[in-house]
Amino acid sequence: MLSPRELQELTRRTIGHYEFNSENYQIGTVDHDVSQNYMAWLDSIEPEIPFKILDFGCGPGRDLRYFKSLGHIPTGIEGSETFVKVARTSIGCDVHHMNFINLDLPQFEYDGIFANATLFHIPRQEINRVMIELHETLKERGVLFCSNQRGNNQEGFSGER
Protein backbone atom coordinates (compact mmCIF):
# COMPACT_ATOMS: atom_id res chain seq x y z
CA MET A 1 0.00 0.00 0.00
CA LEU A 2 1.33 3.40 -0.98
CA SER A 3 1.66 6.08 1.68
CA PRO A 4 0.10 9.52 1.12
CA ARG A 5 3.56 10.84 0.30
CA GLU A 6 4.14 8.05 -2.25
CA LEU A 7 0.74 8.75 -3.84
CA GLN A 8 1.63 12.42 -4.12
CA GLU A 9 4.99 11.56 -5.72
CA LEU A 10 3.35 9.15 -8.16
CA THR A 11 0.87 11.84 -9.18
CA ARG A 12 3.68 14.37 -9.58
CA ARG A 13 5.64 12.01 -11.86
CA THR A 14 2.60 11.12 -13.95
CA ILE A 15 1.61 14.74 -14.49
CA GLY A 16 5.24 15.66 -15.09
CA HIS A 17 5.41 13.05 -17.85
CA TYR A 18 2.42 14.60 -19.63
CA GLU A 19 3.70 18.14 -19.11
CA PHE A 20 7.09 17.23 -20.58
CA ASN A 21 5.54 15.36 -23.53
CA SER A 22 2.48 17.56 -24.05
CA GLU A 23 3.24 18.60 -27.62
CA ASN A 24 4.04 15.05 -28.78
CA TYR A 25 0.96 13.74 -26.97
CA GLN A 26 -1.28 16.25 -28.72
CA ILE A 27 0.17 15.42 -32.13
CA GLY A 28 -0.05 11.68 -31.48
CA THR A 29 -3.66 11.66 -30.31
CA VAL A 30 -5.41 14.38 -32.31
CA ASP A 31 -6.43 11.97 -35.10
CA HIS A 32 -6.79 8.85 -32.95
CA ASP A 33 -10.11 7.27 -33.95
CA VAL A 34 -12.24 6.46 -30.93
CA SER A 35 -15.56 6.76 -32.78
CA GLN A 36 -16.64 3.25 -31.78
CA ASN A 37 -16.23 4.30 -28.14
CA TYR A 38 -18.20 7.50 -28.69
CA MET A 39 -21.08 5.79 -30.44
CA ALA A 40 -21.48 2.83 -28.08
CA TRP A 41 -21.41 5.12 -25.06
CA LEU A 42 -23.59 7.96 -26.38
CA ASP A 43 -26.20 5.46 -27.61
CA SER A 44 -26.50 4.05 -24.07
CA ILE A 45 -27.37 7.38 -22.43
CA GLU A 46 -31.13 7.81 -22.08
CA PRO A 47 -31.94 11.46 -21.27
CA GLU A 48 -32.84 13.94 -23.97
CA ILE A 49 -30.02 15.62 -25.85
CA PRO A 50 -28.02 17.68 -25.01
CA PHE A 51 -26.20 15.53 -22.48
CA LYS A 52 -24.11 16.98 -19.68
CA ILE A 53 -20.82 15.13 -20.10
CA LEU A 54 -17.76 14.91 -17.86
CA ASP A 55 -14.59 14.08 -19.78
CA PHE A 56 -12.41 12.53 -17.07
CA GLY A 57 -8.83 13.17 -18.15
CA CYS A 58 -9.68 15.34 -21.13
CA GLY A 59 -6.07 15.99 -22.15
CA PRO A 60 -5.85 18.78 -24.73
CA GLY A 61 -9.56 18.44 -25.55
CA ARG A 62 -10.01 16.17 -28.57
CA ASP A 63 -13.07 14.45 -27.08
CA LEU A 64 -14.48 17.68 -25.60
CA ARG A 65 -14.41 19.16 -29.12
CA TYR A 66 -16.32 16.17 -30.52
CA PHE A 67 -19.00 16.21 -27.80
CA LYS A 68 -19.46 19.96 -28.17
CA SER A 69 -19.79 19.60 -31.97
CA LEU A 70 -22.76 17.28 -31.36
CA GLY A 71 -24.48 19.92 -29.24
CA HIS A 72 -23.73 18.37 -25.85
CA ILE A 73 -22.50 20.29 -22.81
CA PRO A 74 -19.05 18.88 -22.00
CA THR A 75 -16.91 19.65 -18.97
CA GLY A 76 -13.34 18.43 -18.70
CA ILE A 77 -11.13 17.59 -15.78
CA GLU A 78 -7.42 17.18 -16.27
CA GLY A 79 -4.29 16.87 -14.14
CA SER A 80 -1.93 18.62 -16.57
CA GLU A 81 -2.06 22.41 -16.37
CA THR A 82 -0.75 22.63 -19.94
CA PHE A 83 -3.62 20.51 -21.25
CA VAL A 84 -6.15 22.47 -19.19
CA LYS A 85 -4.98 25.71 -20.83
CA VAL A 86 -4.99 24.18 -24.33
CA ALA A 87 -8.48 22.70 -23.91
CA ARG A 88 -9.97 25.87 -22.41
CA THR A 89 -8.51 28.03 -25.17
CA SER A 90 -9.21 25.80 -28.16
CA ILE A 91 -12.56 24.26 -27.16
CA GLY A 92 -14.19 27.03 -25.15
CA CYS A 93 -15.86 24.94 -22.49
CA ASP A 94 -15.36 24.40 -18.76
CA VAL A 95 -12.13 22.56 -18.00
CA HIS A 96 -10.99 22.11 -14.40
CA HIS A 97 -7.47 21.40 -13.21
CA MET A 98 -7.91 18.48 -10.82
CA ASN A 99 -5.91 15.68 -9.26
CA PHE A 100 -7.56 12.34 -10.13
CA ILE A 101 -6.91 11.02 -6.62
CA ASN A 102 -8.39 14.10 -4.87
CA LEU A 103 -11.55 14.79 -6.82
CA ASP A 104 -13.96 17.61 -6.06
CA LEU A 105 -17.07 16.83 -8.10
CA PRO A 106 -20.71 17.92 -7.70
CA GLN A 107 -23.29 15.24 -6.98
CA PHE A 108 -25.85 14.13 -9.58
CA GLU A 109 -24.52 16.51 -12.23
CA TYR A 110 -23.68 14.50 -15.36
CA ASP A 111 -25.60 12.27 -17.75
CA GLY A 112 -22.36 10.56 -18.69
CA ILE A 113 -18.68 10.31 -17.85
CA PHE A 114 -16.15 9.58 -20.59
CA ALA A 115 -12.95 8.13 -19.10
CA ASN A 116 -10.97 7.11 -22.15
CA ALA A 117 -7.59 5.60 -21.18
CA THR A 118 -7.39 7.48 -17.87
CA LEU A 119 -8.42 5.24 -14.99
CA PHE A 120 -5.22 3.21 -15.24
CA HIS A 121 -3.44 6.22 -13.73
CA ILE A 122 -5.26 5.64 -10.44
CA PRO A 123 -3.46 3.23 -8.09
CA ARG A 124 -5.37 0.07 -7.20
CA GLN A 125 -5.69 1.10 -3.56
CA GLU A 126 -7.58 4.26 -4.61
CA ILE A 127 -9.71 2.97 -7.49
CA ASN A 128 -12.78 1.88 -5.48
CA ARG A 129 -13.05 5.26 -3.77
CA VAL A 130 -12.58 7.13 -7.05
CA MET A 131 -15.21 4.97 -8.78
CA ILE A 132 -17.68 5.74 -5.98
CA GLU A 133 -16.99 9.46 -6.41
CA LEU A 134 -17.53 9.18 -10.16
CA HIS A 135 -20.76 7.27 -9.58
CA GLU A 136 -21.96 9.98 -7.21
CA THR A 137 -21.46 12.71 -9.81
CA LEU A 138 -23.67 10.88 -12.31
CA LYS A 139 -27.37 11.61 -12.52
CA GLU A 140 -29.76 8.73 -12.01
CA ARG A 141 -29.30 6.31 -14.93
CA GLY A 142 -26.08 8.11 -15.93
CA VAL A 143 -23.48 6.06 -17.80
CA LEU A 144 -19.72 5.80 -17.23
CA PHE A 145 -17.56 4.78 -20.18
CA CYS A 146 -14.01 3.68 -19.50
CA SER A 147 -11.33 2.07 -21.58
CA ASN A 148 -7.83 1.05 -20.67
CA GLN A 149 -4.69 0.23 -22.54
CA ARG A 150 -3.77 -3.39 -23.06
CA GLY A 151 -1.48 -4.92 -20.50
CA ASN A 152 -0.54 -8.06 -18.63
CA ASN A 153 -2.81 -7.46 -15.62
CA GLN A 154 0.03 -5.82 -13.75
CA GLU A 155 -0.17 -2.59 -11.85
CA GLY A 156 2.73 -0.45 -12.85
CA PHE A 157 3.82 2.45 -14.90
CA SER A 158 5.70 3.06 -18.10
CA GLY A 159 8.72 5.30 -17.87
CA GLU A 160 8.10 8.07 -15.39
CA ARG A 161 4.39 7.39 -15.07
Region roles according to the model:
Residues 2-48, 145-161:
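Conserved class I S-adenosyl-L-methionine
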Residues 50-52:
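Nucleotide donor/acceptor-binding cores
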Residues 54, 60-102:
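Class I SAM-dependent methyltransferase SAM/SAH-binding core
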Residues 101-113:
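A short acidic, Gly/Pro-enriched loop at the edge of an enzyme's catalytic core
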Residues 111-126:
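A short SAM/SAH-binding and catalytic strip from SAM-dependent methyltransferases
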Residues 128-140:
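A short glycine-rich, Lys/Arg-flanked "PGG" loop and its adjoining helix->strand segment in the class I
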